[in-house]
Amino acid sequence: MNKYDLIERMNTRFAELEVTLHQLHQQLDDLPLIAARVFSLPEIEKGTEHQPIEQITVNITEGEHAKKLGLQHFQRLFLHHQGQHVSSKAALRLPGVLCFSVTDKELIECQDIIKKTNQLKAELEHIITVESGLPSEQRFEFVHTHLHGLITLNTYRTITPLINPSSVRFGWANKHIIKNVTREDILLQLEKSLNAGRAVPPFTREQWRELISLEINDVQRLPEKTRLKIKRPVKVQPIARVWYQEQQKQVQHPCPMPLIAFCQRQSGAELPKLGELTDYDVKHIKHKYKPDAKPLRLLVPRLHLYVELEP
C-alpha cells in the first residue's frame, strides 16, 4: 500500500472512531446511572515527564459529576483538550468505574458499540506503528502532520466493559516491560533509524547518525547467540481488581480510564461494591515476592537494551 492510501485510511478510521465514541457517549448518557466513581490524578507538566514519581495525590469524584467526567474522558484525544502547561508526552489518566443499569437489549447494543470502538482503536494503532514502517522516533511527526495534536496513547487505549461485577477495587502497580530480543532484531531496528536520515531532537542529523552508528557497532561486536533483553520501566499505573461472585473469579485490569460496569436488571444484578484509589507513596510499597533477577549489563541506554550475563 502506498503512503497516500495509508494516510487516507488512517484519516478515515479516525473519523469513524470519533463517530463511534460520540455514539457511545449518547448510549451511556441515556442509561440509568446507579453509581460512578472516578479518581483525578495530578496533571504532568511539560519538562517533568521523565522525573521519577514518588507520590501521587488522588481526588475522588462521585455520582453524576463523575459520570460526566468519565464520558468526556473517552473523547479526550487531542492536546487542545488539556491545558497548555500540560505535557503532550504524558497520556491523560482518569481511573474509576461508571455503573449503569441495563436491559438485555441495551447491554447488547452497548457491547456492540464498544467492540466497534476498540476495533477501530486497534486498527489505528496498527496503521501507525506497523503499516507505516516508521521507527518509533519518526511516528510522532507522521501522526501530527495529518492528525495535529493527537495523543496516540489515549487513542489506542481500549474501553473495558464489565458485566455484573460483584466488586471493583483499585490499587497501584509498579512494573517493568521485559522482552527478549535477538541481535538481528535490534540491528534491523537501528539500521531503519539510520537509513531514515532524519534528525531527532535534541540532536542534529549528523549527531543522530553518529549515535546510531555507535549503537550499531556495540551490537555488532556481540557474539551471535548473545541473550538480549529490553527492560523498560513503566511508571506506576492505576489498576482495578474486579471480583465476580458467581464464578468465584478475580480479574485484574489496567485502569487508565473508567471501566464501564453493566448491571442487568433482568438478572437482578446488584450494585457492585466500589473501592477507593488511595494516594500513592513509593515509600509504602510492599512487594509480596520479588524473585532474584538474572544479572544484566546495560548496552544501549536509549533502547533500555541489556545483555544477559552468564551466572
UniProtKB/Swiss-Prot annotation:
Cellular component (GO) terms are: cytoplasm
Does the record carry Cytoplasm as a key word? yes
Keywords (alphabetical) are:
Cytoplasm, DNA replication, DNA-binding
Query: Source organism's superkingdom?
Result: Bacteria
DNA-binding as UniProt keyword? yes
Q: Which GO molecular function terms does the record list?
A: DNA binding
Specify where it is mainly localized.
cytoplasm
The record's subcellular locations are:
Cytoplasm
What Pfam families does the entry give?
Ter
Gene Ontology annotations of biological process type: DNA replication termination
Function noted in UniProt: Trans-acting protein required for termination of DNA replication. Binds to DNA replication terminator sequences (terA to terF) to prevent the passage of replication forks. The termination efficiency will be affected by the affinity of this protein for the terminator sequence.
HAMAP family in UniProt: Rep_term_Tus
Query: Its family?
Result: Belongs to the Tus family.
Put simply, this protein is called DNA replication terminus site-binding protein
Q: Which organism is it from?
A: Yersinia pseudotuberculosis serotype O:1b (strain IP 31758)
Q: What are the leading ranks of the lineage?
A: Bacteria, Pseudomonadati, Pseudomonadota, Gammaproteobacteria, Enterobacterales
